[in-house]
Amino acid sequence: MLDKIWYRSKPNLLSRVLQPISLVFIDIANKRKIKQQLKQYKSKIPIIVVGNISVGGTGKTPVVRMLAQQYLAQDKKPAIISRGYGAKADNYPFEVTSGTLATQCGDEPAMLFDALQAQVPIVIAPERVQAVKYIEKNFPDTDIIMSDDGLQHYKLARDKEIVVVDAIRMFGNKLCLPAGPLREPIERLKEVDQIIVIGNCSDKDKELLKNYKNVTYAKVVATEFVNILTAKKVAKTEFNHQNAIAIAGIGNPTKFFKTLEESAINITAKKVFKDHHKFTQSDFEGIDSDITVVMTYKDAIKCKNFAKANWWYLDIALDINV
């Protein structure tokens, strides 16, 4: 319901009614920001925060993955910190290892660890400062730390801020919670170092973005399909015009389905779950065992223990237009 209210070009009646609450939200958020900045922790290791000013999935994690791969290619030693949304670790800070389950560390850290083939230390903690201090102590030769989300976590000083924007949703009605989808007023974009817009913007939105510096456009590119059970990789054309069921438990499933359609797969059914859904075998009851199942990388990480031979995830990369 809120999506229908938030993602209109102009505020509707309900958004107007909620605006006074939004003003209270902004006031509380500003006071919290000032309070956190007074006790801000500054690491000797450079820190890049990759975040957003709106709720929901915008593509932060693929950007973090891309940056980590770039640093590795330059023979640098990056590390990643995350809140670990939905994580249930016994203690924090918690380092992700090869035996860590997504339920312990959260979906995104588990996916990043797998995608980066354990080459990058990944540490989670609700208080990101704890994660940074853990890296300083245990990985002192780290060249750079990337924070997956955490733009509004002002207890941690940062050397660079990158905001990721979904080109389809953009900033909705441009109002703050609960009247709109923004965590901070849109003016916050004037303070960040870089804005990465993922997807195809309308001409109107491109005009809006001209008000901000260092705007980079990117698009999600399907690279290959990976078998969840065997890790076998096949070309993205492997399933052209074949029937498949698409599964998505992410913040913005529409983007995933669109990418699949662009890959010429014949999607016969779509099953959508809430973001960070904890998958079990029962979620797949009623699905014909002979039909191909395709899902996101993030969802696949949670289905490895009960995956079937014809279950695949679509891996992606970002094509950056600098």
UniProtKB/Swiss-Prot annotation:
GO terms for cellular component: plasma membrane. ATP binds at residues 54-61. It holds the Pfam family LpxK. Pathway: Glycolipid biosynthesis; lipid IV(A) biosynthesis; lipid IV(A) from (3R)-3-hydroxytetradecanoyl-[acyl-carrier-protein] and UDP-N-acetyl-alpha-D-glucosamine: step 6/6. GO terms for molecular function: ATP binding; tetraacyldisaccharide 4'-kinase activity. It catalyses: a lipid A disaccharide + ATP = a lipid IVA + ADP + H(+). It is an enzyme of class 2 (transferase). Keywords: ATP-binding, Kinase, Lipid A biosynthesis, Lipid biosynthesis, Lipid metabolism, Nucleotide-binding, Transferase. GO terms for biological process: lipid A biosynthetic process; lipopolysaccharide core region biosynthetic process. Its EC number is 2.7.1.130. Transmembrane segments: none annotated. InterPro entries: LpxK, P-loop_NTPase. It comes from the Bacteria. Transfers the gamma-phosphate of ATP to the 4'-position of a tetraacyldisaccharide 1-phosphate intermediate (termed DS-1-P) to form tetraacyldisaccharide 1,4'-bis-phosphate (lipid IVA). Belongs to the LpxK family. This is Tetraacyldisaccharide 4'-kinase.
